[in-house]
């Protein structure tokens, strides 16, 4: 197979909420078709964050290499803009090898930015940020979230009341432009994206079963050594709960436990709750998207159904 001269070579997007079985399904596809997996996960880009991000283990990676994981250390930052640049570069390389990129993950913003590009948001303004930080010191971030709810209810609905970085950025955009950030994101122009995408979404037919999976998943992570993983990362890289890496679901809650802010039982409870909230947001993103081939991630014959559908698309001829 040779795709380099095709104007719009194929790519497969495999999306779904956390604990929906995306990674296992990607392996099934990779064992059946000439694809290469690209991770679309804002936690898996960090080295050493293996357990809490459900990163594929070394045995799987030796069998089926994955792109865009283990890119940076936990004390570094990784943006959606950089993801788009990295992903497009890897996708072109995969296509040049006569294979099809298979993008797998649950970071819906990355999928959106990859297809549509980034909105022309204003750069950070130090004076505005300092003013917002001072207001937050006086009132607290939940109060700042309430202010955002008045100025930009759409964006506020997507942000947790204690997510200081995202609240600050959304308010900053409002103050600098006089417009809600959600409005500016809706107005962004489609960027160049030279691939023909086949979209697959894994959605739960019964959300309570997904919730049970999430509970078991977090318990398994703790049993596998998540607390020690976070402790070692903090010692080696001197990161705290405010760093982007440690704001990832699961890591944030363990940081709070290690800082003696919450008990072990409370850490378990909030870790599961935060993961369920993440799944809820992911499902909201997916239900707003069009052109999806939707499958019940709880279906017993899921792998066979998806493989048959991919085969019928003639992506590899």
UniProtKB/Swiss-Prot annotation:
Q: What class of enzyme is it?
A: transferase
Its keywords, alphabetically, are: ATP-binding, Magnesium, Nucleotide-binding, Transferase, tRNA processing
**What Enzyme Commission number does this protein have?**
2.5.1.75
**Which parts of the sequence are annotated with region: Interaction with substrate tRNA?**
41-44, 165-169, 247-252
Catalysed transformations (reactions): adenosine(37) in tRNA + dimethylallyl diphosphate = N(6)-dimethylallyladenosine(37) in tRNA + diphosphate
Instruction: Give the protein's cofactors.
Output: Mg(2+)
Q: Where is this site: Interaction with substrate tRNA?
A: 107, 129
According to the UniProt entry, its GO molecular function terms are: ATP binding; tRNA dimethylallyltransferase activity
Residues annotated for ATP binding in this entry: 16-23
InterPro entries of this UniProt entry?
Dimethylallyltransferase, IPT, P-loop_NTPase
Magnesium keyword on record: yes
Any idea which positions bind substrate? Answer: 18-23
- Presence of keyword Cytoplasm: no
| Top-level taxon of origin | Bacteria
Report the SUPFAM superfamilies cross-referenced here.
P-loop containing nucleoside triphosphate hydrolases
What Pfam families does this protein map onto? IPPT (PF01715)
One GO BP on record is: tRNA modification
Q: Which family does it belong to?
A: Belongs to the IPP transferase family.
Q: How does it assemble?
A: Monomer.
- Function summary: Catalyzes the transfer of a dimethylallyl group onto the adenine at position 37 in tRNAs that read codons beginning with uridine, leading to the formation of N6-(dimethylallyl)adenosine (i(6)A).
Q: What is this protein called?
A: tRNA dimethylallyltransferase
Identify the coding gene: miaA
């Amino acid at each position: 197979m040779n795709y380099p001269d095709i104007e719009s070579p194929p790519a497969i997007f495999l999306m779904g909420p956390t604990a929906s079985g995306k990674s296992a399904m990607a392996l099934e596809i990779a064992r059946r078709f000439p694809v290469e997996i690209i991770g679309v996960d804002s936690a898996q880009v960090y080295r050493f964050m293996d357990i809490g991000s459900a990163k594929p283990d070394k045995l799987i990676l030796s069998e089926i290499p994955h792109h865009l994981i283990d890119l940076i250390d936990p004390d570094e930052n990784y943006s959606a803009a950089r993801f788009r640049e990295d992903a497009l570069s890897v996708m072109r390389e995969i296509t040049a090898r006569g294979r099809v990129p298979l993008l797998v993950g649950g970071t819906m913003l990355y999928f959106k930015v990859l297809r549509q590009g980034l909105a022309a948001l204003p750069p950070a303004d130090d004076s505005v940020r300092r003013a917002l930080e001072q207001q937050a010191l006086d009132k607290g971030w939940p109060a700042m979230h309430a202010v955002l709810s008045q100025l930009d209810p759409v964006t506020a609905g997507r942000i947790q009341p204690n997510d200081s970085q995202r609240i600050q950025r959304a308010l900053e955009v409002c103050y600098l432009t006089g417009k809600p950030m959600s409005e500016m994101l809706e107005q962004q122009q489609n960027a160049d994206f030279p691939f023909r995408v086949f979209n697959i979404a894994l959605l739960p037919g019964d959300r309570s079963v997904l919730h049970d999976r999430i509970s078991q998943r977090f318990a398994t992570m703790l049993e596998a050594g998540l607390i020690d993983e976070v402790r070692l990362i903090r010692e080696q890289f001197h990161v705290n709960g405010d760093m982007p890496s440690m704001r990832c679901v699961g890591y944030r809650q363990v940081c709070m436990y290690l800082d003696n802010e919450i008990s072990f039982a409370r850490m378990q409870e909030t870790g599961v709750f935060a993961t369920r909230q993440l799944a809820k947001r992911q499902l909201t993103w997916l239900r707003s998207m069009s052109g999806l081939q939707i499958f019940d991630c709880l279906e017993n014959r899921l792998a066979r159904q998806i493989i048959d559908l991919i085969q019928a698309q003639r992506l590899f001829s």
